[in-house]
From Swiss-Prot:
One of the primary rRNA binding proteins, it binds specifically to the 5'-end of 16S ribosomal RNA. One of its GO terms (molecular function) is rRNA binding. Part of the 30S ribosomal subunit. InterPro entries: NA-bd_OB-fold (IPR012340), Ribosomal_uS17 (IPR000266), Ribosomal_uS17_bact/chlr (IPR019984). One of its GO terms (cellular component) is cytosolic small ribosomal subunit. Disulfide bonds: none annotated. PANTHER family: 40S RIBOSOMAL PROTEIN S11 FAMILY MEMBER, SMALL RIBOSOMAL SUBUNIT PROTEIN US17M. This is Small ribosomal subunit protein uS17.
Amino acid sequence: MAEAEKTVRTLTGRVVSDKMDKTITVLIERRVKHPIYGKYVKRSTKLHAHDETNQCHIGDKVTIRETRPMAKTKSWALVDVLERAVEV
């Protein structure tokens, strides 16, 4: 029997914190339609992701994937930095 390949969940968001060692906080924003009024409303969630090389900084646009739990609240890992933040 061949094992079925699992689909890996990936999300895209902005880094809002890089103060922890090898960990970033990513803000994921999505739009959902209100069930009664039909207006689109922004919903967001913050996820902790593993950044092995500490390459991300605040404001970077990144892609993360779901992985095994690495800590109590960290079960996502950095895949790619899509866009660097503008340095002032």
